[in-house]
């Protein structure tokens, strides 16, 4: 009996130890789970606040379809301000990440280059061509974080009844001036390629049609193929009291495959907002995809925004429809080489850099030795494609 009692006692003791051990395991598991839950919650909370509540994007012109993906972030129900010539509002919920709540979109500043706008801290991001980022790379430390359109709609147009142009070199033979904004890289390229002379360059363009109308389209003029072509052929009475056909070359047609209006930041600002950009850039690019899939709500809103701004710039449904059609026809809104609608193609950037370096060396303009230093594709990793 004693033997049996001893065994029973040992059994009870063993059971008690096992029970205690099991209790310790359960408590440890509970503690671990609680810690993991807390850590996850803290991580989520941190991710929810990695972005500023408000951001400002500086565009390179008045509201137009070529900016559609940026306006898509706010949607058609934002607020247009005539005094500041801006558009602002809450970021649509499907694009709001990292604690970002509001966005302001500023239009062109005629008295200030966008690189200076960034340098002076007047915007967080700005539209600047990749060529211009390269040109300013020694003077202003900027970095491109994403594209807008894939191909540049920038063009040079002319009256085909006054100038018989069969190839870009024919522009030079006419001796006619080329009206353009100052400081444009593609004009430097055209001069360097022998498509025009420096004497033909007239950098006094202000974006209006007044000079073209006054002189009956006797010269060459810059513009967007997705915009001005329609206006001069349908809206602007510039020849014999009515609109007339124009011909054009895009800068890509002439071999200058620039990236237009890339989303650019000061390098230190991008570093500061690194965690934010990891979340935000894919959403910004999703907004571009969404806009291109259904542009009308935004392009219709842009008509009204320009009316509120009450300047010389105006849009119409016909213009917007024609512009979107041309974007698709000329594949100006295609995916990047990696399948995203976001990244900069390294080979294309290197080719552009080579074209510009020769020009800038001749002009005495110092630029970076490494084109990859002016752009990053790191934030495009989670970006969608079309």
Regions found by a protein language model. Name each.
Residues 29-47:
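Extracellular mucin-like PTS domains
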Residues 272-362:
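Secondary-structure end/capping motifs
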Residues 1-9:
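Bacterial N-terminal signal peptides that target proteins for export
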Residues 23-25:
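Bacterial signal peptide processing site
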Residues 346-386:
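Conserved C-terminal helix/tail region of periplasmic/extracytoplasmic solute-binding proteins
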């Amino acid at each position: 009996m004693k033997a049996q009692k001893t065994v029973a006692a040992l059994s009870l003791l063993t059971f008690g130890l096992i029970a205690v051990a099991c209790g310790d395991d359960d408590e440890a598991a509970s503690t671990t789970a609680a810690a993991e839950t807390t850590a996850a919650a803290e991580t989520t909370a941190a991710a929810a606040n990695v972005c500023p509540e408000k951001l400002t994007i500086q565009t390179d012109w008045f509201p137009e379809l070529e900016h559609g993906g940026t306006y898509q972030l706010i949607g058609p129900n934002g607020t247009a301000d005539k005094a500041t010539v801006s558009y602002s509002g809450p970021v649509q919920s499907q694009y709001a990440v990292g604690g970002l709540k509001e966005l302001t979109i500023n239009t062109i500043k005629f008295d200030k280059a966008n690189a200076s706008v960034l340098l002076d801290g007047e915007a967080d991001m700005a539209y600047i061509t990749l060529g211009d980022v390269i040109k300013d790379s020694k003077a202003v430390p900027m970095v491109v974080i994403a594209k807008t359109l894939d191909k540049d709609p920038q063009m040079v147009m002319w009256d085909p009844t006054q100038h018989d142009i069969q190839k870009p070199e024919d522009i030079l033979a006419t001796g006619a001036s080329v009206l353009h904004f100052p400081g444009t890289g593609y004009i430097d390229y055209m001069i360097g390629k022998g498509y025009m002379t420096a004497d033909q360059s007239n950098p006094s363009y202000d974006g209006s049609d007044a000079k073209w109308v006054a002189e009956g389209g006797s010269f060459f003029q810059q513009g967007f193929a997705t915009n001005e072509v329609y206006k001069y052929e349908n809206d602007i009475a510039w020849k014999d009291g009515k609109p007339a056909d124009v011909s054009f070359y895009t800068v890509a047609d002439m071999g200058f495959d620039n990236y237009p209006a890339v989303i650019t930041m000061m390098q230190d600002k991008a570093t500061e907002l690194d965690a934010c950009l990891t979340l935000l850039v894919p959403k910004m690019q999703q907004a571009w995809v969404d806009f291109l899939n259904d542009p009308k709500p935004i392009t219709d809103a842009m008509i009204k925004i320009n009316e509120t701004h009450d300047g010389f710039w105006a849009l119409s449904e016909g213009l917007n429809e024609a512009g979107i059609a041309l974007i698709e026809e000329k594949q100006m809104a295609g995916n990047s080489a990696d399948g995203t609608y976001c990244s900069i193609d390294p080979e294309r950037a290197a080719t552009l850099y080579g074209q510009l370096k020769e020009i800038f060396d001749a002009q005495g303009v110092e630029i970076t030795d490494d084109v990859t230093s002016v752009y990053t594709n790191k934030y495009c990793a989670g970006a969608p494609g079309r």
